[in-house]
Regions:
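N-terminal carbohydrate-binding accessory modules
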Residues: 33-96
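Bacterial N-terminal signal peptides
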Residues: 15-28
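Aromatic-lined substrate-binding rim segments of carbohydrate-active enzymes
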Residues: 81-142, 154, 209-212, 293-304
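N-terminal secretory signal peptides that target proteins for export/translocation
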Residues: 1-11
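Extracellular glycoside hydrolase catalytic/binding regions
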Residues: 39, 67-79, 154-175, 179-357
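Short amphipathic alpha-helices and their capping/turn segments at secondary-structure boundaries
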Residues: 42-48, 84-91, 124-126, 164-166, ...
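Short acidic-hydrophobic catalytic motif
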Residues: 150
Length: 358
């Protein structure tokens, strides 16, 4: 037997350590982009030291490792990502890109973990930063991530962030969204879907991110698929660079301004909040008041100075009918059902491109 042989578990640990070190080297091989650094002060976001309202889009083309990417829309998104798409995002008027990243693909104990996937995520984020965008990296546990681990944040998300946080710790132009849409249902749902359970899951992730040396702004999604924020507890952050994320999707109890005030709006008056995901899906929800809801929500977010990240730039029939080379979805002559091309693409593009808007 080779005198330098190591037990299998030790060899595995050494390989993971070298893989992580290699990824960090790739990130630091060139200076981090100086522009687009994000911080929080009071209840507002700052970009390069100036008050900022995010205007962003989601990218889902790196939501799962390649071999675990399923579904026509996600496969299309994966294949079309590149410099041409990023230039289209710029022309759309966005200044921030949100990447959904697989929890399982980033968790060394997961069956779908892949060091190559982490390199791919890092390369995509670097490309966006080099193009001048601020970035959000969001850990996703839902089915499109390659495994269905929907529910509340737990040790899986913490392990994923111990892999991810060191990769982005040197660039404050990258915000870290800890866990996409804590949910009351799913394989990893908790017995109690409440704020104490939420805090018990989120705080260890905050600690892991800061222990990795990351000084980035941290974003924490609220309860009920990230729709609820009012009464959210504070999380302990030694850097006080912590903010909240809301996903204000249409629901029966979430249709008018009074609902929005009660569920997240009043909270946003005293806490930094960003809407990191939003859209209207006329293939699933087509009540007569949905177009009014969509227009009203955009105006509401603007009035509250809450940034908006539209989902998703690379997924068909959301912002664009097919892809970024073709027409935007529209609220004119709304159609319902699986073949609907209706949506808020034109609405959001108009907001993002209007220089008179904040």
């Amino acid at each position: 037997m080779d005198g330098f042989a190591q037990p299998a578990a030790t060899r595995s640990g050494i390989c993971l350590a070298f893989a992580a070190a290699g990824l960090i080297f790739l990130l630091n091989a060139s200076p981090a982009a100086a522009a687009g650094e994000v911080s929080v002060r009071g209840n507002e976001f700052l970009r390069d030291g100036k008050p900022w309202i995010a205007k962003g889009v989601g990218i889902v083309g790196r939501t799962a490792p390649a071999e675990f990417t399923k579904g026509k829309g996600y496969l299309q998104a994966r294949n079309q990502f590149g410099a041409e798409e990023l230039e289209s995002v710029r022309q759309f008027g966005a200044n921030v890109i949100r990447f959904q990243v697989s929890q399982g693909g980033s968790d060394p104990q997961s069956s779908i973990y892949s060091a190559d996937y982490l390199k791919e995520v890092l390369a995509a984020v670097k490309m966006a930063r080099d193009a001048g965008f601020s970035v959000i990296v969001c850990v996703d546990s839902q089915r499109p991530s390659g495994l269905d681990e929907t529910g509340m944040p737990n040790a899986k998300a913490e392990r994923a962030w111990r892999s991810l946080a060191p990769l982005f710790a040197k660039d404050r132009g990258i915000m870290l969204e800890l866990f996409n849409e804590p949910a009351p249902k799913g394989p990893d749902a908790a017995p109690q879907n409440d704020w104490p359970t939420w805090r018990a899951g989120m705080q260890p992730i905050v600690d892991a991110v800061r222990q990795a040396g990351a000084r980035n702004v941290i974003l924490a999604d609220g309860l009920d698929w990230a729709r609820m924020l009012n009464d959210a507890p504070a999380l302990s952050d030694p850097l006080s660079q912590f903010a909240y994320a809301v996903h204000p999707y249409y629901a029966s109890n979430f249709r008018v301004e009074a609902d929005w005030d009660n569920i997240f709006g009043r909270f946003a008056a005293t806490h930094p909040v960003m809407a990191t995901e939003w859209n209207v899906n006329f293939r699933k929800v087509c009540n007569p008041d949905v177009p009014q809801f969509a227009r009203g929500m955009v105006e509401y977010l603007k009035s509250k100075r809450i940034g908006l990240v539209e989902w998703a730039y690379d997924f068909p029939r959301t912002i664009f009918v097919a892809d970024y080379r073709g027409p935007l979805t529209t609220l004119q002559d709304v159609q319902c059902g699986n073949d609907s091309n209706s949506g808020v693409g034109e609405l959001v593009a108009g907001y993002f491109k209007d220089a008179s808007r904040p």
